Amino acid sequence: FNTFIVMRKISFVLAAIMAIALNCNAQSSNGCYRGFIDAGYSIGVGDYEFGRFEVNTSHGYQFNPYLFLGAGAGLHFMSSYETKDMDIPLDVRDSQVDIPVFANIRCNFSKKKVSPFVDVKGGTYVTNNGGLYVNASAGCRFAINEKQAVSLAVGYASEKLEFETFDRFTSNTSMNYTRSPRKLDTEAITLK
C-alpha cells in the first residue's frame, strides 16, 4: 500500500514536469494553421478517485489572435482501479489506455507575451466501448518567441468510462459472483 502512495506521488511529480515541458504550441497571430501538444495529469474526484497521465494533441485554424477551433486526439494512461475499502470491490477497471477524439475551441484574452485563456474539448472515447469526454480548463500562455509558447492550465473533466461492476452472487450459499460491464460517470481535476 505504501508503495502505491509513493508511486502515485512520483507519477504526479513526473506528470507536472512533463506538462511544463510538453505543453507547447506552434502559434501565429491570425488566419493560419495552429497545433497544440499538451501533457498533464488528471486527479479523480467524487466516487472514482483515480489518477492518470494524459497526452493530447489538437490541430486546427487560428481565426484571429483570440480564437482557435480545431480537433484532436489523445492517449490517457490509467492504472488499474478497484473500489476502496470493500472485501468485494463494487467497481473494477484494468490498467488501460483510453483514446479520446474531440473538437477543441480555445480563446485567448490578450495578444501579449503572457495571456490568460480558456480551452474546451468535447468528444468521445474510441477505445474500451466509447464514452463521453469533456474537458474545460483555464490557464495562462507564456510566449517563448513568435511561433512557440508554453501554457499552464487547471481544468475539470467529465468522462463516461467503462468499469466491470459487481452484478450478483451466483447462489445463496457461496461467495461466487459475476460482474457486468457498465459505463459510469467520472470526474477529474486536470493539471496541464
Question: Residue ranges of each PLM-predicted region?
Answer:
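Outer-membrane beta-barrel "beta-signal"
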Residues: F102-I105, K183-K192
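Solvent-exposed loop/turn segments connecting transmembrane beta-strands
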Residues: I43-R52, S95-V97, G123-Y133
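Transmembrane beta-strands of outer-membrane beta-barrel proteins
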Residues: R34-G40, G72-G74, F117-K121, A153-G155
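Extracellular loop and loop/strand-boundary signature of outer-membrane beta-barrel proteins
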Residues: S42-V45, D87-V92, G122-V126, G139, ...
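Transmembrane beta-strands of outer-membrane beta-barrel pores
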Residues: Y41-V45, L75-S79, C107-K111, G122-N128, ...
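Glycine- and aromatic-enriched membrane insertion/assembly motifs of diderm outer-membrane
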Residues: D47-K112
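Repeated loop/turn-to-beta-strand initiation elements of outer-membrane beta-barrel proteins
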Residues: Y66-L69, K112-P116, F142, E146-V150
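Bacterial Sec-dependent N-terminal signal peptides
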Residues: F1-Y33
